[in-house]
């Protein structure tokens, strides 16, 4: 079952696609929450970049997963996805790989703060969530941001999944942060 919320982040309206387990409205259970990035790619091909989605809801339904998913749509303006998903502007490694010094990035910390301080409380108020069972997952730059958020908020996110993470954008910084996080 899918619902859509609209939130405001960085002075822009953004969709958050919510997946609820099939039995959500017929039970009184509480559920863990998985926060994801690039929400337009999570559930359906209609709005997915390139017309291909993860079809996550089909897999969750098939395996009867007791999980709420909150998938935040990306900012599609210019390089804003890079700006929002990269905690730091750039690193030496990204310059080496890209062949130029990128000025993109640097809003990832604010984006992670938004999820923890605004979106998570909204989800906790609106849905029957399970206290202390919050996860985050992302692909590419979303993987970088997920690892960053897990390091910044280890008491909030119990599990992190970074798939094909684009660490190269902030390689040195994320290694240093991950190495200093208990």
At which residue positions do the language-model features occur?
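Non-catalytic cap/lid and distal C-terminal segments of serine-dependent acyl enzymes
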Residues: 1-182
């Amino acid at each position: 079952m899918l619902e859509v919320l609209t939130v405001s982040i960085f002075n822009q309206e953004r969709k958050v696609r919510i997946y609820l387990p099939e039995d959500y409205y017929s039970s009184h259970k509480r559920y863990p929450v998985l926060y994801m990035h690039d929400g337009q790619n999570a559930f359906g091909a209609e709005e997915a970049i390139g017309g291909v989605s993860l079809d996550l809801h089909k897999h969750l339904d098939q395996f009867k997963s007791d999980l709420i998913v909150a998938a935040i749509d990306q900012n599609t303006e210019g390089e804003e996805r890079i700006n929002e998903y990269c905690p730091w502007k750039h690193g030496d490694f990204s310059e080496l790989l890209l062949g130029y010094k990128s000025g993109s990035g640097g809003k990832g910390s604010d984006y992670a703060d938004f999820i923890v301080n605004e979106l998570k409380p909204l989800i906790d108020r609106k849905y029957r969530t399970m206290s202390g069972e919050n996860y985050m997952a992302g692909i590419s730059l979303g993987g970088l941001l997920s690892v960053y958020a897990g390091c910044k908020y280890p008491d909030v996110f119990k599990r992190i999944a970074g798939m094909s993470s684009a660490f190269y954008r902030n390689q040195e910084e994320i290694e240093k942060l991950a190495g200093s996080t208990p």
